[in-house]
Amino acid sequence: MRFGLLGRKLGHSYSPQIHSLLGDYEYPLYEKEPEEIEAFLTADGFDGMNVTIPYKETVMPYMSQLSETAQKIGSVNTVKRLPDGTLYGDNTDYYGFSYMLDRAGFDVKNKKVIVLGNGGASKTAVCVCRDKGAKEVTVISRRSETDNYQNISKHSNADYIINTTPVGMYPNNGESPIDLTIFKQCKGVADLIYNPSKTQLLLDAEKLSIPHVNGLTMLCAQAVKAAEIFTNQKFDSNKATAITKKLEQQMLNIVLLGMPG
């Protein structure tokens, strides 16, 4: 079985490590430029593939079938080659994000949610929150005339905040996309960044005693779902949590080993 990850810059990826815990199959990284995508997808070089930025929308026209979730969100992160050689596209980020909210105990039903950023991950977050019955879901973006970072204070009554922007990861370590202190009734903060494991936004949440979660659980949960699609086998519902804990321990060991003294 030949699986792997398709993207443009993949040196930082934890995906091969995660998939090594999910099955005995190859999972190489495929770094491709935009002009190489068509030839890569149409060649018979893989049985299944995960897709990351910037190609989650690019691959859609090459799919002969799309899951309902992929159609609803408008992006594909999991591709499987069907017996007739054509490609099926799904979006397991939806499952991963939903799993992350559930495990963190973030119940968005009838609550107000703001989502920072308007990229592909933002679409997934919005879709899941609406499906879970959120009362209001507002996307905050720099280019929006109505809901942007300059007037974000009008949403200071938000119950949950979800960051889907890269602010907080390299080279923006130590930066937060918002001032969390204005959100007096915030019940939870989710940051889809997982490296560093605690962004400035999450450190601020910790300081304010607001429950918070990073994106590692989502990453592991979507990988478990993708592996189920690839291999046609079901994993235990706690598999993603077990893998998340294992990776967290490894990341902690790396930090400790790198400390001076």
Language-model region placement:
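Extreme N-terminal starter segment of soluble prokaryotic enzymes
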Residues: 1-4, 251-253
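Phosphate/diphosphate ligand-binding glycine-rich loop within oxidoreductases
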Residues: 2-104, 196-198, 204, 208, ...
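Glycine-rich adenosine-cofactor-binding loop
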Residues: 7, 91-94, 101-102, 110-130, ...
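Short helix-loop-beta connector
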Residues: 106-111, 184-185, 250
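NAD(P)-binding Rossmann-fold cofactor-contacting core
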Residues: 132-148
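Rossmann-like adenosine-cofactor binding region
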Residues: 147-212
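Adenosine-phosphate binding glycine-rich loop
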Residues: 192-252, 256
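Walker A (P-loop) phosphate-binding loop of P-loop NTPases
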Residues: 261
